[in-house]
Amino acid sequence: MDDYKYQDNYGGYAPSDGYYRGNESNPEEDAQSDVTEGHDEEDEIYEGEYQGIPHPDDVKAKQAKMAPSRMDSLRGQTDLMAERLEDEEQLAHQYETIMDECGHGRFQWILFFVLGLALMADGVEVFVVSFALPSAEKDMCLSSSKKGMLGMIVYLGMMAGAFILGGLADKLGRKRVLSMSLAVNASFASLSSFVQGYGAFLFCRLISGIGIGGALPIVFAYFSEFLSREKRGEHLSWLGIFWMTGGLYASAMAWSIIPHYGWGFSMGTNYHFHSWRVFVIVCALPCTVSMVALKFMPESPRFLLEMGKHDEAWMILKQVHDTNMRAKGTPEKVFTVSNIKTPKQMDEFIEIQSSTGTWYQRWLVRFKTIFKQVWDNALYCVMGPYRMNTLILAVVWFAMAFSYYGLTVWFPDMIRYFQDEEYKSKMKVFFGEHVYGATINFTMENQIHQHGKLVNDKFTRMYFKHVLFEDTFFDECYFEDVTSTDTYFKNCTIESTIFYNTDLYEHKFINCRFINSTFLEQKEGCHMDLEQDNDFLIYLVSFLGSLSVLPGNIISALLMDRIGRLKMIGGSMLISAVCCFFLFFGNSESAMIGWQCLFCGTSIAAWNALDVITVELYPTNQRATAFGILNGLCKFGAILGNTIFASFVGITKVVPILLAAASLVGGGLIALRLPETREQVLM
């Protein structure tokens, strides 16, 4: 009995060396009952049969059958991992050879434009709310805090989408999850143009942001797996042009659609579909077109091989090869690959079958299984062998996002500040004026009236814009059909005066004294001061800022594979930091626009190199997950940068400039600690 140390689950014994031997008998089987002695085994009826207890012979047979699988499970995770890593390394080099045979041609260019539209939709999403807000705030009566939440909710959604959908793409497939991502964005972006309430609009933009948040990580992971090493850096950089195109598209559409107030309709008094809603729908078109076109593209063969789907991957690679060869005029060339290495599969997906559970139980098990796989994959990126690369990349991504998005919001805010200061410098001040029996039916704008006296005056069908009445006496005056913006009465005495059909609400009268005055049928609707005109200069600024990255995109694409990813990141971030100091000389609108274009043009190379090196540093089964984590952190940096930089507008330029420069210098230097991936095959 020394060789048998423990009892198994079936009442038998297992050897002490940890392996089952099917030809060894259980020692207890030698002991026979006196009751059954002398009976034929064929005639014997096992008494436990009626109680559902398995016969010892059945147990023995089952143990013998299960022995090989138990032996496999006892080999340990370490051996399986080592074997899988060896398989993945062999596959990486073989796949590189296969992509060289497939060539770079028509297939990659078709996929380039399809995925480019998805990336364009990501660029549009960043701008659409900020462009629509000046008009939407009137329809929804938005306060400053609500407008701020709308601006932030898009980034929150994109941050969540990057985390979730990036992880799913490594488990369910690039094409499948990207299609889901685009469908969610297109649906809720379009729906947001029809909803009337602030809460519903906020919710739609949040879900829309979650949908498009997964586009960037998946697009770069997806496209990289159809590129050979020699083409990867350059063509991933070319793909970045579509993000710039998204900004141009949004700016151009806002400029051409939103000012046309007649481009809409009304249904009754409560439902209004104005031109800004048309703009929101138009901005969903790139996403919709990309979603439809993606239906005709195949799944990534590299992902399929990672999942052990050899035949399906082979068919797609043959399709890539044949498409490119036909386009080059050599259709007779045969795809010579017959067998491709597939990594050993470590975990099998298990779910309850229809005969053993209800539909919601099966979906619950499926959800839990996928969630655990995605979570474990994410933990592996930040705690496994890639943790140092992930940490360095996280710092660089955050530094870039904090400075870039912070300054791109700060630039328009500073331009508005310069406009406001110039506007205030032209303000007219009237002191001690006396007006009797006048009829005023024109626009009064940018004026201050102090210590005046207005008697028996009539204000009718007029517009007050940025007007202040201070310490003024109104006697027997009549206000009819008056509209106002940023107009206030301060320390005034108002006697025997009638206000009929005006929007001069109670909060516009500050410390005023009323004597026998009456308010009749005040205007309904929003009681807040809202600008009547859209600032077209802001559209122009965004358009020029997006256009300015084109030279940087071209240069980075041409040099990416020549000078390497690290020099591109470090050089671009350090040059951008130097450009920040020129902002001290930005004391006018035109100067600020010029420095913005310079900053955007120099920083885009770092963004492109970051996209490329992030794709190349991680293996196929972690590529989209890691990209999603880093891109989600990027959106968090954008939120933080927007909030901090905007708080210093009109106070000081020193803090935003120093913060941006320090962030860029620090990120650029830390990036140099990353490994160069220019000559690396895609694992």
From Swiss-Prot:
It is a multi-pass membrane protein. The modification Phosphotyrosine is found at Y423. It is found in: Cytoplasmic vesicle, Secretory vesicle, Synaptic vesicle membrane; Cytoplasmic vesicle, Secretory vesicle, Acrosome. It comes from the Eukaryota. The modification Phosphoserine is found at S33. N-glycosylated. One of its GO terms (cellular component) is synaptic vesicle membrane. GO terms for biological process: chemical synaptic transmission; neurotransmitter transport; regulation of presynaptic cytosolic calcium ion concentration; regulation of synaptic vesicle exocytosis. PROSITE patterns: MFS. InterPro entries: LD_SV2 (IPR055415), MFS (IPR011701), MFS_dom (IPR020846), MFS_sugar_transport-like (IPR005828), MFS_trans_sf (IPR036259), Sugar_transporter_CS (IPR005829), SV2 (IPR022308). SUPFAM superfamilies: MFS general substrate transporter, Pentapeptide repeat-like. The chain crosses the membrane at residues 109-129, 149-169, 183-203, 206-226, 238-258, 278-298, 391-411, 536-556, 566-586, 593-613, 627-649, 654-672. The modification Phosphothreonine is found at T36. Residues 1-42 are annotated as: Disordered. The keyword Iron does not apply. Residues 130-148, 204-205, 259-277, 412-535, 587-592, 650-653 are extracellular. Residues 1-108, 170-182, 227-237, 299-390, 557-565, 614-626, 673-683 are cytoplasmic. CDD domains: MFS_SV2B (cd17438). Glycans are attached at N441, N491, N516. Interacts with SYT1 in a calcium-independent manner. Forms a complex with SYT1, syntaxin-1 and SNAP25. PANTHER family: SYNAPTIC VESICLE GLYCOPROTEIN 2 (PTHR23511), SYNAPTIC VESICLE GLYCOPROTEIN 2B (PTHR23511:SF2). Probably plays a role in the control of regulated secretion in neural and endocrine cells. (Microbial infection) Receptor for the C.botulinum neurotoxin type A2 (BoNT/A, botA); glycosylation is not essential but enhances the interaction. Probably also serves as a receptor for the closely related C.botulinum neurotoxin type A1. Belongs to the major facilitator superfamily. This is Synaptic vesicle glycoprotein 2B. It comes from Homo sapiens (Human).
